[in-house]
Amino acid sequence: MSKMRNLVEEKFLEFYESWVIQLELYLHQLLIAHNNNTMSETELRHLISKLTTHHKAYYTAKWAAIREDVLAFFGSVWLNPLENACSWLTGWKPSMVFRMVDRLRKSRVVLVEAQVKKLEELRVKTKFDEQKIEREMERYQVAMADRKMVELARLGCHVGGESVMVVEAAVRGLSMGLEKMVKAADCVRLKTLKGILDILTPPQCVEFLAAAATFQVQLRRWGNRRHYVTHS
């Protein structure tokens, strides 16, 4: 049985479903651009800008929501179980996109030596940042595992005035630490995405963004289908 959603979860669920629908529309445009070699560089850059703006809008909405309830983003109700299972600190793992670039290189994307060097430097920097965040996150693993304490405070169950105050103070401290970690992880995601787009040419950016959007859309479809079959 699914847990009752709070207002933050309801609002972000509505936002995210709309955001994904728009992502699918942009994916369609990316695929047209990829298959149509007649588009100018200016047109490609305009399309790339629309995608980056769309991603920035997601993080703007996300950061506003986590200020109200960061715990809602761990085991998010707007994601299916497969999407949640693939999540790294409430989002995609930055180093994953380099494997995506590697697959594109093996298939059809040709990079010059300078691009390869810059990508490798960015890969090393991204991995370093990931590991730094993971070390910080270890401090919160024990507290995060005890969701019963969290739900007790959020549902307002009273087990004695002083005890409740202690629990609520612990949850506030936990939430502040988690918000810091989530924002740090999101910043690495955004820096990695920008870094890759700065290195690739406009046609390569279109192909990369199409691959990334396809993965996200297909993961959601597979997860929804699997969840529907399991619960039907």
UniProtKB/Swiss-Prot annotation:
Disruption phenotype: No germination phenotype.
InterPro entries: Seed_Dev/Stress_Resp_Reg, TGA_domain
GO molecular function: sequence-specific DNA binding
Domain DOG1: 9-229
Pfam family, one: DOG1
Gene Ontology terms: biological process: DNA-templated transcription
Classification via PROSITE patterns: DOG1 (PS51806)
Residues annotated as signal peptide: none
Superkingdom of origin: Eukaryota
The protein, known as: Protein DOG1-like 4
Organism encoding this protein: Arabidopsis thaliana (Mouse-ear cress)
